[in-house]
A protein has these predicted regions:
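Active-site mouth of glycoside hydrolases
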Residues: 1-241, 246-252, 257-271
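Active-site-adjacent "gating/activation" loops or surface patches in catalytic cores
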Residues: 268-272, 276-277, 281-285
């Protein structure tokens, strides 16, 4: 059984991720998502123990629907919200919070089994995050005003990547020019952090390698943004995997589970095995 979205906040919206009103695992009423609700943790532990008694193995998810709120000590004002994608793979504070949750949920000793999840043979795998990627949604992800600092962070990282690869704007311009057409805009300069990434949708965006060279989705810009995304994915997953091993996790570790496109596939190669979401005949109530 996959223990999924245990980190979700209490929600009223139909079809939304939400936890038990009386006993959520994380006690968001304290103004942050960093502490367990005592009854919620007890229910979680009891459920794990009963599954184990029946010979049912456990798939442990880490971040799924975590509600990042101002009380978590975020880098920027306001609440980032629940189920956000991509930004928790870039932002240092969000990564720290993910590691904190991983340590607390995996190293806590279950009073019903006498074991922490890191030592329990009923656990067969730990998954780092749910349906996420550093290139998911590209530069147009989450247009809420309060998320602008997080979008800026991605753009700044991309520009730093371009400077590291090319050194100067002139060399970048040369690399992005084909048959007299340049994909780099006159106003774009990596030293000023103004080079835009690729526009796209929920998955890795598509690109025609023979398409128009000078547009935002040009093959040159696309290739560098995908290389950047692969690098960010692998850096994040390698770091998280090293941290989980330092806690004592012994089972195979999965990176994520909604991989679409060759760049995304390569960006998730650091998992011990692969997962991908496939939904069949799902009822929505």
């Amino acid at each position: 059984i996959r223990l999924h979205a245990a980190d979700a906040p209490i929600g009223e919206e139909p079809r939304s991720w939400s936890s038990c009103k009386e006993a959520p695992l994380l006690d968001y009423e304290k103004g942050n998502g960093r502490e367990f609700h005592l009854e919620g943790l007890d229910r979680f532990d009891y459920f794990v123990a009963k599954l184990k008694e029946r010979g049912i193995y456990l798939h442990i998810d880490l971040i799924v629907a975590r509600d990042f709120v101002e009380g978590d000590g975020l880098d920027y004002p306001g609440n980032a919200g629940s189920c956000i994608k991509r930004f928790p793979m870039y932002n240092k504070r969000m990564i720290e919070l993910q590691k904190e949750y991983a340590r607390k949920i995996l190293c806590h000793v279950n009073p019903y089994t006498g074991l922490a999840l890191i030592d329990d043979p009923a656990v067969i795998t730990v998954q780092i995050n749910n349906e996420d990627s550093a290139i998911k949604g590209t530069m147009d992800t989450d247009q809420r005003e309060e998320m602008q600092p997080y979008r800026d962070e991605v753009q700044n990282r991309f520009n730093s990547f371009l400077l590291m690869k090319y050194g100067t704007r002139e060399r970048l311009k040369e690399a992005w020019t084909f048959e007299g057409k340049c994909a780099l805009g006159e106003e774009e300069d990596p030293e000023k952090g103004t080079v835009q990434g690729t526009a796209g949708n929920f998955y890795q965006p598509e690109c025609d390698p023979l398409g128009k060279w000078e547009e935002n989705e040009s093959p040159a810009r696309y290739a560098d943004f995908m290389e950047f995304g692969i690098t960010m994915n692998r850096n994040f997953y390698q770091d998280m995997k090293d941290y989980l091993h330092s806690l004592g996790v012994k089972v195979p570790i999965v990176t994520s589970n909604l991989v679409a496109g060759a760049a995304d596939v390569y960006g998730h190669t650091d998992g011990d095995f692969r997962e991908n979401s496939i939904f069949f005949n799902v009822r929505l109530v």
